């Protein structure tokens, strides 16, 4: 699956999947074949960080 380039769209997609289908970012990345480091880096570059307890980016 190709991820959106737009940070707001990526934020929305990731948080929807984390809320509805995955118990953690690790599980999402493993299932979708994504690099957790790349996702976290892209989101940090856009000003967002992952909250493990809430299982979402904010």
Each predicted region: which residue ranges?
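N-terminal acidic leader/helix
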Residues: 1-20, 24
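Short, acidic, Ser/Thr-enriched surface-loop or helix-capping motifs
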Residues: 52
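Short acidic, Pro/Gly- and aromatic-enriched capping/linker segments at domain boundaries
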Residues: 35-49
């Amino acid at each position: 699956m190709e991820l959106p380039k737009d940070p707001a769209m990526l934020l929305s997609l990731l948080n929807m999947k984390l809320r509805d289908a995955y118990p953690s970012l690790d599980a999402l990345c493993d299932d979708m074949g994504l690099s957790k480091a790349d996702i976290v880096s892209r989101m940090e570059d856009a000003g967002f960080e992952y909250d493990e307890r809430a299982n979402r980016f904010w």
